[in-house]
Amino acid sequence: RVLVVDDSRLQRRILTASLQRWGFEVQEAESGEEALRLCRDQPPDLVMSDWMMPGLSGLEFCRKFRDLQQESYGYFILLTSKSDKDEVALGLDAGADDVLIRPIGPPDLRARVMAGERFLVMQRELTQKNKLITETLDVLRQVHALIDKDLIEAKKFQQSLLRERYRAMEGGNLSMMLRSAG
C-alpha cells in the first residue's frame, strides 16, 4: 500500500494515477497531519510526500513517521523542487529513503518506486529469516539444556557404579572417574 501526501490535489491525482497503473493500492492525504493519522491506523508500505506543505511539512512528517512504532519498515520518498544538495541531504538525514526532485518523469518515478519495492521485499525476507533463525536458536537452546541434563544424570550414574573414586598409588592418586572438559 502506498500513501501519497500532497497539499495539491492535482499532484496527488497525477501520482495516484501512475501508481495505480503500475498495480499499487494507493491512499491519499492532503496534509502531513492527516497522513500521520492514517499511518497510525494502518501503516503504509511506501510513502510519497511533498516536502513543502502548510502545517506539518513533509520533512516534519517524515521525522514523525520514523518515530512511529511499526512492525515493518515503511519506505519514504520525499518530493521536492529543491535541487540543492544540502537540502537533499537534509531530507535523507530526516529519515527519507529517497528524495525526488520535481518535475518527475514517469520513468524516473517508476524506477524509484520499484527500487523502494525491492527494498521492502528484501526487508520482509530478512525479517522472516531472522524469525526462523530465532526460533531455531530457541529450539537448539532447549536441546542443549536437555543434553546437559542427561549428562548430569549420566555423571551421577557413573559415580554410583564406582566402588572407589580414587586409588592411592605410589607417587600420587589415580582418579577412577572421567570428567568432561566442558
Annotate each language-model stretch with its function.
Residues 37, 59-70:
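Short amphipathic alpha-helix used as the core "switch/output" element in two-component signaling
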Residues 10, 30-34, 57-61:
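Acidic catalytic/metal-coordinating carboxylates
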Residues 13-21:
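Charged docking surfaces used in two-component/phosphorelay signaling
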Residues 42-48:
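Active-site beta3 strand of CheY-like receiver
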Residues 12, 53-55, 80, 84, ...:
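The feature encodes the CheY-like receiver
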Residues 60, 72-73, 83-98:
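Alpha4 helix (beta4-alpha4-beta5 surface) of REC/receiver domains from two-component response regulators
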Residues 135-182:
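… and, occasionally, acidic/histidine-rich disordered N-termini of signaling adaptors
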